[in-house]
């Protein structure tokens, strides 16, 4: 299974960071470089219908080798990495036979991956880990998923004794900025059901996710020389702070877990004259999700009424919804994945996704798509890592799912 590791190391060398502020599709041209590379690799494997469209979506399929009518099965991952941290010049480090102590990622900058801060790493004592060098994210989200899917499909194509229906694979741009499914052609993809391989911890199986929205707030001020500012100046930074204080502090990401939702400020740029804020809003409950959006709108209204002028402009935009209602209609897709994990000695961890995947949107576009683990941990930052055995097991799970569908 060295193959999956080699692929992963190759893919993370591509800088594919997406950009929320871009209006192009994909949001960054550099995602296309990886996409075109994947196209050539899929052709070499011998897949059919290999293509990359103008929007950067890569698709291909392996034809069925049985006559039995079974659902066409899809596997999907995304090519972009998070805007939250650089994905340029990723330099993976191997930690073999992890001993349970601190891992020095970057000695010069004193960046340490410590069990004191990330106690879950102790689960992987004795295993080989791939970490960052402390300067970038790693890109396991979701280049590990791409490597796992391609390795599994390559293995199946080389072993005709493995019976299977049609297997479709797709790699999307811009998932990290909530646009991964925007131009996904479900009909062209050709699957009846699918799985994203975009989860985290070893064994994760997910079919519930956040309802998600973004909020962009612009606060207008009035700049006057501070020496003569009394009763004249309106400091937009101060007004923005007022707005922030109206958000429930206990409902921030750092205070929530499980099925709890949150408000998360992700950007703050300001001067006296103008301040811009960006939030993301998340909740599993549709009602609580709507309440959270309303609270933000009401906060803007309250401040504008307080000052007697429209200082605060707010735009709230839905991004994706909880896929559970769609997956429940075809629950067998979860049951088969659960069984596949058990058969290859992976303990399934069925839990809600405290985030989103392309599968959330795709499920509402007629393609039910739960989420499988990649094995990665601490996504979107310099403390990201992935155990190599988890990647190898993810490949086994994909192959076993394919086999079980052929028996359906």
Swiss-Prot record:
Catalysed reactions, as listed in the record: Release of the N-terminal residue from a tripeptide
Recorded family membership: Belongs to the peptidase M20B family.
Protein residues bound to Zn(2+) 1: 78, 141, 198
CDD domains in alphabetical order: M20_peptT
Lineage: Bacteria, Bacillati, Bacillota, Clostridia, Eubacteriales
PANTHER family for the chain: PEPTIDASE T
Free-text function comment from the UniProt entry: Cleaves the N-terminal amino acid of tripeptides.
InterPro entries linked: ArgE/DapE_CS, Bact_exopeptidase_dim_dom, Peptidase_M20, Peptidase_M20_dimer, Peptidase_M20B
GO molecular function ontology, one term from the record: metallopeptidase activity
Top-level enzyme category: hydrolase
Necessary cofactors: Zn(2+)
Top-level lineage group: Bacteria
Protein name: Peptidase T
SUPFAM superfamilies in the record: Bacterial exopeptidase dimerisation domain, Zn-dependent exopeptidases
EC number: 3.4.11.4
Cofactor note: Binds 2 Zn(2+) ions per subunit.
